[in-house]
A protein has these predicted regions:
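Active-site proximal loops enriched in glycine and acidic residues that flank catalytic Cys/His/Asp
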Residues: 48, 72, 101, 283, ...
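C-terminal amphipathic alpha-helical interaction region
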Residues: 503, 508-704
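Composition- and surface-driven signal marking solvent-exposed, interaction-prone regions
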Residues: 220, 295, 317-318, 344-348, ...
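Catalytic pocket of metal/acid-base enzymes, prominently hydrolases
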Residues: 2-31, 45, 127-132, 137-150, ...
């Protein structure tokens, strides 16, 4: 194991074209112009871009870069890139120069026809554009290809529609900035110039041995196991969570941290998660668009470094049945450029009128658009996880904690909030331990949307998904709530009276969304139904929320999406679901036909030979015969279920693409997949391990 010491302060951000590098390398005027673009949205002229491009190129070459790429996030859910070298056409001498222009920096032209567009673009309409997002720093990535200058960009069509996640994210950030500033001005704040959503996504993942991974076609093709019986031990002892990190995993984490720190990702926390072989990495907060980029870098780095350590990183939400799946807690807050966190309640929240207005606006936003928030976490893999006593329920509710709930109860019942519950001190009963301050409220891990001191934690997001979508929705629905509140308060004759009445009104009208209890309980499901809260269990049930009149009006009002963009994204979501389930079904068919059935046939022959041999020796062969009969019966069930899955999968392929096909995959194909898995998993508990054609769950999650 390497004992080489790392000086984090020295290496952090060394491969990032950050503010320090720009100040050092750019002429003062160019630097000021770029900062105006970053901070105020001023347009960048080509002359300035040329200077920036030249210095960026020189800096990247010093880092060993030979190529650059416009690094963007199309609607595939994973980053895309095309690499171009810095070399220009050869000179008469035969030598080449290294060049990179301002035009090449600010705009690229990838073929848009091969990316999902949901009908926005025909196949022959190939032109698309990438545009430099100068608010997210460029960085040099080091990998097997060498060193590449990665330039974060947005991606749009020839006619201007967003074909990516970043464009609407930036639009939503503009929306909440504008409306939050309106709200701050009402409270006399004249100093804050910009309000930015801050995001800190906690990334969960599994690690398995690469050799064992390569023996599982389901993991290779789908990212999750489609067959597999539980080993004798799972997670029931709670001994993996926060347990001692194994040496192999620790070495992996060390390399991950080093690579992330070099590209400016503030990897902060790492630990074992609940399930065996499951782990978590969490960064420090960053501005939303940078946090989204950083999370993509985190996922890429986890996968790349795992391979270097002879492992595979699984980012699927549910790679193994029977143990916890993986999510990505999206910690969200809104902060000003001069350091004000608008979600900080202070020591006496009942006296903090601005905070109470912000809080009740957020309650209104979540209550009005719970379906949209749920849709933002919709993913085929997440269907296995949500509502399964390991992740938040599929019902959106807000946890506020005792202190804030008490303040709102006072407002609702009496019209005045006169006090806030205090935290006090925690008594341990041990004199040698320090006195600990006790928070005013506990935490609730079963809540999908929880207030945790000075931020909200949205816990529904899937582990492999970009955090762009939930933050687009959060930013936009809160911008709407702020805008509506400002429309009322800006017209008020008596601001203090009007804001008091509005806080009480919002608290009362949106009380149903607040729930501080056990989100895993069946009682909550019944209570939520009585409250009229939507319970959306599957991705296909969630997708329609994107294209309701309410959603279209919301997103068009704040310039985040057009109706056409929303319709295209809904279409892509349906296609994504259908394709994912189709691949899983075809993989199950392939594995059952080519691996399991041949193995079962061989094993029944072995059992039959054993029965005959024992009987021929004059001994009692009833036990052997009983095992043979059981295996034969389960093999028959497997063949019947396999034929049924083949039939229904072919039927699904013939359905019209879109909602009809996706719903058929959900209602008919997925249950047929479960029906095939059941007898195979039973057989795994009977068949000789030497005869089983692939590594078991025990091999995968306990031998890494």
């Amino acid at each position: 194991m390497s004992t080489e010491k790392i000086n984090v302060a020295e290496i952090f951000g060394e491969n990032v074209f950050n503010d320090t590098v720009m100040q050092e390398r750019l002429p003062k005027k160019v630097y000021k112009n770029l900062k105006k673009t970053i901070e105020e949205g001023k347009e960048l002229d080509l002359e300035t871009a040329d200077v920036i491009a030249h210095e960026m190129k020189e800096w990247a070459i010093e880092k060993g870069a030979t190529h650059y790429t416009h690094w963007f996030l199309p609607l595939t859910g994973v980053t895309a890139e095309k690499h171009d070298s810095f070399i220009s056409a050869p000179q008469p001498s035969g030598k080449v120069l290294m060049s990179f222009s301002g035009k090449e920096l600010i705009k690229g032209e990838p073929d848009a026809s091969s990316f999902p567009s949901g009908g926005l673009r025909a196949t022959f309409e190939a032109r698309g554009y990438t545009a430099w997002d100068c608010t997210s720093p460029a960085f040099v990535r080091e990998d097997a290809a060498g060193a590449t200058l990665c330039i974060p960009t947005a991606f749009c069509s020839y006619t201007g529609e967003a074909l990516d996640q970043k464009t609407p994210l930036l639009r939503s950030m503009e929306a909440i900035n504008k409306q939050a500033l309106r709200l701050l001005r009402l409270f006399g704040n004249t100093t804050s110039k910009k309000v930015t959503p801050s995001v800190g996504p906690e990334q969960e993942y599994f690690l398995v041995d690469a050799e064992k991974f390569e023996q599982r076609k389901d993991l290779i093709y789908t990212g999750r196991t489609l067959f597999g019986a539980m080993p004798p031990k799972g997670q029931e002892l709670d001994d993996h969570y926060f347990g001692t990190i194994r040496q192999r995993i620790a070495a992996f984490m060390k390399d991950v941290n080093e690579q992330l720190w070099k590209v400016g990702v503030t990897a902060k926390t790492q630990h074992n998660e609940v399930a065996p072989a499951q782990h978590e990495l969490a960064p420090i907060y960053a501005e939303a668009n940078i946090a989204v980029d950083h999370n993509q870098i985190v996922m890429q780095t986890l996968k790349r470094v795992a391979c270097q350590h002879g492992m595979k990183c699984l980012l699927h939400e549910k790679p193994f049945a029977g143990v916890n799946g993986s999510g990505k807690h999206n910690n969200w807050s809104i902060t000003t450029d001069d350091g004000i966190n608008m979600l900080d309640p202070g020591k006496t929240p009942h006296e903090n009128t601005q905070f109470l207005l912000v809080l009740t606006c957020i309650l209104r936003a979540v209550n009005m658009h719970a379906d949209l928030l749920r849709e933002s976490a919709a993913d085929p893999g997440n269907d296995h996880r949500l509502g399964a006593n390991e992740a938040p329920p599929a019902i959106i509710s807000v946890f506020l904690g005792e202190q804030l709930e008490d303040v709102l109860e006072q407002l609702i019942s009496t019209g005045e909030a006169t006090h806030s519950l205090k935290g006090g001190k925690l008594e341990t009963g041990v004199r040698t331990l320090p006195e600990l301050s006790k928070d005013a409220t506990d935490r609730n891990r079963t809540s999908p949307f929880a207030f945790t001191g000075n931020k909200f934690e949205f816990r529904m997001v899937g582990s492999r998904d970009s955090v762009a979508s939930p933050n687009i929705v959060l930013n936009t629905i809160v911008a709407e709530a702020f805008a509506d509140a400002c429309d009322i308060l800006e017209k008020a004759d008596d601001f203090d009276l009007a804001v008091h009445d509005l806080i009480k009104k919002y608290a009362t009208e949106n009380q149903r969304i607040v729930f501080n209890g056990d989100g895993y309980s069946e009682a909550w499901v019944e209570e939520a139904e009585r409250r009229g809260l939507p319970s959306i269990r599957s991705m296909v049930d969630a997708i329609p929320a994107m294209v309701t009149d309410k959603a279209v009006n919301l997103f068009e009002r704040f310039g985040v999406f057009t109706k056409a963009e929303l319709e295209s994204r809904a279409e892509i979501q349906y296609e994504t679901y259908a394709k994912a389930i189709n691949i899983e079904a075809r993989t199950m068919i392939d594995m059952a036909s080519k691996q399991f059935m041949p193995a079962f046939i061989k094993y029944t022959k072995t059992l039959a030979d054993t029965v005959n041999s024992v009987a021929a020796a004059g001994a009692d062969a009833s036990v052997q015969k009983e095992v043979l009969d059981e295996v034969t019966a389960l093999m028959g069930e497997t063949k019947k279920a396999l034929d049924a899955l083949v039939k229904v999968t072919d039927e699904a392929a013939a359905k019209e693409e879109g909602a009809e096909q996706a719903n058929f995959y959900h209602s008919d194909v997925f249950p047929a997949m479960e029906a095939l898995r059941a007898p195979v998993d039973k057989l795994e508990m009977i068949v000789d391990k030497e005869a089983w054609p692939m590594p078991s769950y025990g091999d995968l999650i306990f031998e890494v």
